Amino acid sequence: MEALTPRQTVRELDKYIVGQEKAKKAVAVALRNRYRRSKLKEDLIDEVVPKNILMIGPTGVGKTEIARRLAKLVKAPFVKIEATKFTEVGYVGRDVESMVRDLVETSIRMLKQEKVEEVEERAKRLADERIIELLAPYPNRPTQTKNPFEMLFGGVQDTQQEDKSWEQQNSRIKFERETLREKMSRCELEKDYLEIEVEDQSTPMLEVFSNSGVEEMGVNMQDVLGSIFPRKKRKRKVTVEEARKILTQQEAQKLIDMDELTAQAVKRAEDHGIIFLDEIDKIATREGTTGSADVSRGGVQRDILPIVEGSTVMTKYGPVKTDHILFIAAGAFHIAKPSDLIPELQGRFPIRVELESLSRSDFEQILTEPQNSLIKQYTELLGTEGLKIEFSKNSLVEIADIAYTVNEQNENIGARRLHTILEKLLEDVSFEAPELNGQSLTIDSDYVREKLKDVVTNRDLSRYIL
């Protein structure tokens, strides 16, 4: 894990997310505290638990993106879960422990990818050798067992001749392999075909079973059945280029110690994992209501509580402690309030950050400032058709103003409004782009107003289209 200072973390997040300084600072400090904890003495490490964060703010202002970018920044296992997907224990649906299992799966996948990259060069060399062997296989050595009568009537001479012939073939194959290696180094064999053996991924009778019934045990039925019914191998005819990819994966798998990888991945999930609980306001029990749905919501909160507090969850990779996993909960809290969550759960999210609604200037910055801004994305997309597209400064101001106005008049969906507006604005250009190869188009404020005037002025129409 990279040891970034809070200021460095905020600076990195600024490359992708506009505004929301309070939220960025909160997650940056939480991240730095993990690094500080790792420097403590053994007797104190277990005592220091992460301070979980509750983000409050409307949709589309950057709650999820802040958490996702943070995890990517430090290469930490990250899962985003919607709290509304969970049901109480005993009811049909996903149980809350599944989020910890998902986190471990993510950690295994991440670490496996890292290990594969580490051994990739070696695996490629081994794969190339296997390709050479398949293209020019050595002949089988002639059997030495002979009939006793043959030994009496010149059988020894025949055997010597066969051995000599086999040695000659071997010499020829060695020379052929050297020639193939030279051709391979010059990439002259890439389009040649050969047959390789691959594992058949299908498992017999898997459709009879359902993973959901055994999910709470942390058991994958495909793995269980895979050990009962060994996977069959089948032959595939592929090019040398494709064969190299397949065989490199196979060789990389052999070079990786999966037991060691699993132990490291579980440890990484426990110490550095981030679980993002979205829509947590939807499971809050509102004051003065006592319906069956509210009882269910309260039950889900009580089920989440021990995991956030710190408990041990059984997975197919072994027990996983949740004591030091960072939980970031988020919700709009339009109807419910944070105080509508059960008191015990409120206490487990001591850091509360309110994210602000986006202003006109925020929308303008979102269009151009982030590293992979929306304007850059659309410009590059249409550029693949040979169409050069440019947005003038006043067109960006106009687009930002329309996004802000429509959000104020209708549902406030934050920065996502820009996606719908840009899609509508560039609808005709995207359709005609293949016929405009080699041309240039400048989009100014007049063009924006012309394309969007009907939608913006008609409130009912904007509600459906934008």
Curated annotation (Swiss-Prot):
Q: What Gene Ontology molecular function terms does this protein carry?
A: ATP binding; ATP hydrolysis activity; peptidase activity; proteasome-activating activity
What biological process terms from GO does the record include? protein unfolding; proteolysis involved in protein catabolic process
- The question of whether ATP-binding is a record keyword is answered with yes
The residues that the entry says bind ATP are 18, 60-65, 278, 344, 416
Q: Name one GO cellular component term.
A: HslUV protease complex
Q: Which Pfam families does the UniProt record give?
A: AAA, AAA_2
* Top-level taxon in the UniProt lineage: Bacteria
Check the record and name the SUPFAM superfamilies matching this protein. Answer: P-loop containing nucleoside triphosphate hydrolases
Q: What is its main location?
A: cytoplasm
Gene3D superfamilies xref list: 1.10.8.60, P-loop containing nucleotide triphosphate hydrolases
Location in the cell: Cytoplasm
Quaternary structure (record): A double ring-shaped homohexamer of HslV is capped on each side by a ring-shaped HslU homohexamer. The assembly of the HslU/HslV complex is dependent on binding of ATP.
PANTHER family in the record: ATP-DEPENDENT CLP PROTEASE ATP-BINDING SUBUNIT CLPX-LIKE, MITOCHONDRIAL-RELATED (PTHR48102), ATP-DEPENDENT PROTEASE ATPASE SUBUNIT HSLU (PTHR48102:SF3)
Q: Which family does it belong to?
A: Belongs to the ClpX chaperone family. HslU subfamily.
Q: What is this protein called?
A: ATP-dependent protease ATPase subunit HslU
From which source organism is this entry?
Answer: Desulforamulus reducens (strain ATCC BAA-1160 / DSM 100696 / MI-1)
